[in-house]
Amino acid sequence: MSSMEKHLFNLKFAAKELNRNAKKCEKEEKTEKAKIKKAIQKGNTEIARIHAENAIRQKNQGINFLRMSARVDAVAARVQTAVTMGKVTKSMAGVVKSMDATLKSMNLEKISALMDKFEHQFETLDVQTQQMEDTMSNTTTLTTPQNQVDNLLHEMADEAGLDLSMELPQGQTGSVGTSVASTEQDELSQRLARLRDQV
């Protein structure tokens, strides 16, 4: 097995691993949704909110893994074409040196940077490249949009046949509009003030 064939194998393996991670996130999301229902049934809105945030975070992370899996898979196909056509250049050989460790790390930002280098090299070989959306760094934040959390809480409450509107702060039960954003900002300010008072 040549060096490039070995790297090609590793790319395909990494794509499968990323896909596996996406499925794991999907499973975790379902688990968190079940916990939301239980918490709502017990009247623990704050606990339900935490599980809703976790569910949305798992969903976003799963999407990120799927996107990166597709991107790595696309690069693997390009490597396969380049190997088949004998168009592997010296500059390409330089890019693959750090590949194995990067792919094994399952670090989305590092893999994304590696894919950037590969895609740049293939552009110079006149192989068409299709960029995915902006790299994962902006979407892997720890914060979750509150309107998504609130929507998920209501969805789980509806599925459980419960009324959650009495327990949520006013202004977050209807359609999400500009007033919700200001209400959320006010809530954040109040929570921050309470934290300061406790210190």
From Swiss-Prot:
Residues 8-42, 178-199 form a coiled coil. Probable peripherally associated component of the endosomal sorting required for transport complex III (ESCRT-III). Belongs to the SNF7 family. Residues 170-183 have a biased composition (Polar residues). A motif (MIT-interacting motif) lies at residues 186-196. Probable peripherally associated component of the endosomal sorting required for transport complex III (ESCRT-III) which is involved in multivesicular bodies (MVBs) formation and sorting of endosomal cargo proteins into MVBs. MVBs contain intraluminal vesicles (ILVs) that are generated by invagination and scission from the limiting membrane of the endosome and mostly are delivered to lysosomes enabling degradation of membrane proteins, such as stimulated growth factor receptors, lysosomal enzymes and lipids. It is a peripheral membrane protein. This is Charged multivesicular body protein 1b. One of its GO terms (cellular component) is ESCRT III complex. The gene is chmp1b. PANTHER family: CHARGED MULTIVESICULAR BODY PROTEIN (PTHR10476). GO terms for biological process: endosome transport via multivesicular body sorting pathway; late endosome to vacuole transport; protein transport. It is found in: Cytoplasm, Cytosol; Endosome; Late endosome membrane. It comes from Xenopus laevis (African clawed frog). Pfam families: Snf7. The keyword Coiled coil applies. Transmembrane segments: none annotated. Keywords: Coiled coil, Cytoplasm, Endosome, Membrane, Protein transport, Transport. Residues 167-199 are annotated as: Disordered. InterPro entries: Snf7_fam.
